[in-house]
A protein has these predicted regions:
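ASCE RecA-like P-loop NTPase motor cores
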Residues: 2-709
Length: 709
């Protein structure tokens, strides 16, 4: 254990050497022993556990890394400062190891709740993304317990594919979530997965998954209390969250969600008791008056609206009858009905009462969207730490007035990283652009050239694209190129595919890759960025900007700024799936990006200081040709495509006349003249054809067949 005393020195009387270099001891303040229950007494033990993990894993500290981790430990143990803190510890910087070191010591202390520090700490809540991680931490905390000794930690995890695939179904009939009968199962009353929430109060260390945390935010009071076997009650005062939780919540009000919320309400209580029938009748009447009828009025009122989305003012909602007084009355009836706080009806009513920005959106049906930024709180002290390597890029952390961003980033140069930026716009690298005729074939041609070149320097390449494209693109690659890329299996078992956006988060499977190619950008629907702009709006500036927007809301600066930050965040995470997360390594790493927005590239350069950026303005000519020969107009081949395909069918050394070309393609004289002036046709003539003669005597001879049909 480190020395459990604090030495403080007055700023006005800092020690300085006398003539004989002796320090005057009287200038020091008296030594003050730490209190017996001071959690800072654990700091030395945590660092010792951290050193042990680094040693057993064959890792060494980078310059300044141990000091940075020690400072984080000190902050975590300092309960004099309450609040929510974001810890921007870079991916690969020791976050997971630090969490395990903290839990190792917390578990040791919590085995004896008579320990003063254990009593002051009360217990810990830990939140992870995956059930497998939770299982691992539960086992870590409970390691070394004597027979009959109560568990120190418990994972609260319900029915999901992972648990069922581990054989945790009591009846043995469910192997996936879709197989589980849930409440209709004959063993539902005794199923530990369905009744997981009954075990909240059984151990000092409680392990949750992100999905459950998101359900209960912002109030985590139900997760703070627990009792020993003798009934002694304790309050957990610390929560450690691995990666940023879903702090932006979006409540959607539509005919579908109103119906679903009402059906859920009716199913909660038995209607046989007369009093309950009366209560349901009163609740339904209030619900219809406050929400259903006003929404129907709004739907009729907006039926002629030309815009797809727009901000809704409080006056517009009040005009259709969606008023605060009516909604508060519904809230009172929901309380009398004892509706669960996270039930859809309660959430919808609370959201509509919020003063945050709301907007309507036309998709398949009218939707009123109410985004909000959640915080973390309880009815007692609960210090919260969110460990996120990209916290500075996440607006819900960096711009959240309720969260303090700790200055804990490790200084590092990324000279070994080169970012290649492909800018050629002949192929739109969006989801829509890559579904256009010929786009995927053109991309495959580019990759056929690029992959062998990159693999020669780096070995296997992490090529990531959209999920809808991941199987098709893999099949289009020649066998030689398929062996140069990482592959994964489609979740539905339909076969191998390329890794895809949204499917590699948190994976260490590609940690040895030194080249990453992102084919496309990991964008989500524009409406999502609009929601985030309204939710993350501490001073109301975004709402004001969007209220006066003359153009589409998703094109407004505040929404585009949200998009840029989230794209940069996702691309940084993608880069760290590779060997780049091996800090201190000198192996060169390449990141290929296709048509990233300028602001996104700037954010990446700021995040990766000293990295090199290589702009690639054009794709190979055969990629351009592949797009041009497949171009369509109103479902039929374009005139340019018809002419190009006819020219490519001419064997090398053979001749053809314009009249023959018009006959083969069905083009008129004017259409032929227009098509022959197209840049792609001009380029093909420049590289593979010569013409001689003029007028009716003109002939066209193919002299090269490098782009043979």
């Amino acid at each position: 254990m480190e020395n459990p005393v604090v030495t403080t020195v007055s700023a006005d009387t800092a020690p300085h050497a006398s003539d004989d270099r002796a320090v005057r001891v009287e200038e020091f303040s008296p030594l003050r022993p730490r209190a017996e229950d001071d959690p800072q007494r654990l700091r030395g033990r945590v660092m010792k556990a951290l050193d042990h993990y680094f040693l057993t894993r064959g890792s060494t500290y980078l310059s300044g890394q141990r000091e940075a981790l020690s400072a984080i430990v000190k902050t975590v143990l300092d309960d004099s400062h309450q609040g929510v803190f974001a810890v921007p510890l870079v991916p690969g910087g020791g976050k997971s190891t630090l969490l395990r070191a903290l839990l190792t010591v917390f578990a040791e202390v919590s085995r004896d709740m008579s320990d003063p520090i254990a009593q002051r700490l009360g217990g810990v809540v830990v939140v992870v993304e995956k059930t497998a991680e939770g299982d691992e931490l539960e086992e870590l905390c409970n390691r070394g317990l004597e027979p009959g000794e109560p568990a120190v930690a418990r994972l609260i995890s319900s029915t999901n594919d992972y648990n069922l695939q581990q054989g945790k179904c009591l009846t043995g009939t469910a192997a996936t979530y879709a197989d589980c009968l849930r409440k209709d199962c004959p063993s539902a009353a005794v199923c530990p997965l369905l009744n997981a929430m009954m075990h909240l109060a059984e151990s000092p260390i409680l392990i949750l998954l992100h999905a459950r945390l998101a359900q209960h935010l912002p109030d985590l009071t139900p997760f703070t209390s627990w009792c020993e076997a003798d009934g002694t009650e304790h309050r957990r005062t610390l929560i450690l969250i691995d990666e940023c939780p879903a702090l932006v919540r979006e409540e959607v009000v539509s005919t579908l969600t109103i119906n679903a919320a009402e059906n859920d309400l009716l199913a909660q209580r038995d209607s046989r008791p007369r009093e309950m029938r009366h209560l349901k009748w009163r609740l339904q009447g209030s619900w219809n008056h406050a929400i259903r009828i006003p929404f129907d009025r709004l739907n009729r009122q907006l039926s002629g609206e030309k815009r797809d989305a727009a901000i809704l003012t409080p006056e517009e909602l009040s005009d259709v009858g969606m008023t605060g007084s009516a909604l508060r009355e519904t809230q009172e009836w929901l309380t009398k009905y004892k509706a669960p706080p996270f039930s859809p009806a309660v959430r919808m009513t609370e959201a509509l009462l919020q003063e945050t920005g709301k907007f309507f959106h036309f998709g398949k049906n009218l939707e009123v969207v109410v985004p909000s930024l959640q915080t973390i709180r309880s009815d007692g002290p609960l210090r919260s730490f969110i460990f996120s390597g990209t916290a500075g890029l996440l607006p819900e952390l960096a711009l959240n007035p309720d969260i303090d961003l700790l200055p804990t980033e490790l200084p590092e140069s990324y000279e070994r990283l080169t970012i290649h930026v492909q800018r050629d716009g002949v192929i739109g690298m969006t989801r829509t652009g890559l579904q256009r005729s010929g786009a995927v074939q053109a991309v495959a041609l580019w990759l056929q050239r690029l992959l062998p070149e990159v693999a020669q320097r780096h070995g296997r390449v992490l090529l990531v694209t959209y999920k809808f494209l991941s199987q098709q693109l893999l099949e289009l690659l020649e066998e030689e190129c398929r062996s140069l890329v990482y592959t994964v299996n489609m979740p539905d078992g339909s076969g191998p595919c390329l890794p895809y956006f949204g499917g590699v988060a948190g994976s260490n499977e590609f940690r040895d890759a030194t080249a990453v190619i992102c084919l496309g950008m990991p964008r989500v629907e524009p409406r999502v960025y609009l929601s985030r702009a309204l939710a993350i709006d501490p001073d109301g500036a975004h709402r004001e900007e969007l209220s006066h927007a003359a153009e589409a809301l998703e094109r407004q600066p505040c929404v585009l700024d949200m998009q840029d930050h989230y794209l940069a965040h996702d691309l940084v995470q993608m880069a760290f799936r590779s060997r780049l997360r091996h800090h201190g390594d000198t192996t060169p790493v390449e990141l290929w990006l296709t048509q990233p927005p300028g602001p996104v590239l700037k954010l990446l350069r700021d995040y990766f200081p000293d990295c090199a950026v290589d702009e690639c303005p054009t794709l190979p000519e055969d990629c351009h040709l592949a797009v041009s020969t497949a171009r369509q107009r109103k479902g039929s081949p374009a005139n340019t495509a018809l002419l190009l395909n006819a020219l490519l069918a001419v064997p090398e050394g053979e001749e053809i006349t314009p009249a023959q070309l018009r006959e083969q393609t069905g083009l008129t004289q004017n259409q032929y003249k227009e098509a022959i002036r197209a840049p792609s046709v001009k380029e093909l003539f420049r590289t593979e054809f010569i013409t001689f003669g003029s007028g009716k005597n003109q002939k066209i001879r193919r002299v090269s067949s490098k782009n043979a049909a």
